[in-house]
Design a protein with these regions (language model features):
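Exposed, low-structure sequence patches enriched in small/polar residues
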Residues: 1-172
């Protein structure tokens, strides 16, 4: 498993333009164990990454404040992940014992029933008065199986008023 990232503040000499990129890769069976009591979870949640194991993920973020009261934030997350298929353990489910795998070798990241997901988000905030914000966001999520058998796309548009609260980012 690895995680690499970089952040560039005031990118290209443009004040208040911040760029961030990240890449995560976890091989099959990485956080699983021979039983669910000793795997890498806490309260049935993965400790290392919400995707568990058997995935490759790329993340890009842009945060820009063009004017003192305006903020623009964009994020794109793309990942592919191998899911278990027809009772065969391909290492994507960390709650499944690694002893149930079919072989000891030959597993690749994304192996099994491969899915590809793209999650894109655009948020715009305007500070009307001190600590009073108007927020607009548009989010698109595309989820599809690599073999083209099934897909699920969703679009979410939100608008809100925020008073004296920090903006929360939900990466899902």
């Amino acid at each position: 498993a690895y995680q690499l990232g970089a952040k560039y503040i005031d990118a290209f000499g443009i004040k208040n333009l911040d760029l961030q990129v990240e890449s995560n890769r976890v091989r099959p069976f990485t956080y699983s164990h021979n039983d669910t009591v000793t795997n890498y979870t806490h309260y049935n949640q993965p400790l290392a990454d919400p995707l568990g194991a058997n995935f490759q993920e790329y993340i890009g973020m842009v945060n820009y404040q063009p004017l003192p009261k305006w903020n623009i934030y964009a994020r794109a997350i793309y990942y592919y992940k191998g899911l278990d298929s027809a009772g065969i353990n391909f290492g994507g489910d960390i709650f499944e014992s690694y002893n149930t795998r079919s072989n000891d070798f030959g597993f690749a990241v994304g192996g099994g029933n491969k899915i590809k997901v793209l999650n894109a988000l655009l948020q715009v905030s305007y500070e009307v008065k001190q600590n009073l914000f108007l927020d607009l966001s548009l989010q698109q999520r595309n989820y599809k199986y690599a073999n083209g058998s099934e897909s699920n796309n969703s679009t979410l548009f939100t608008a809100g008023i925020r008073l004296n609260m920090a903006k929360r980012q939900y990466d899902y």
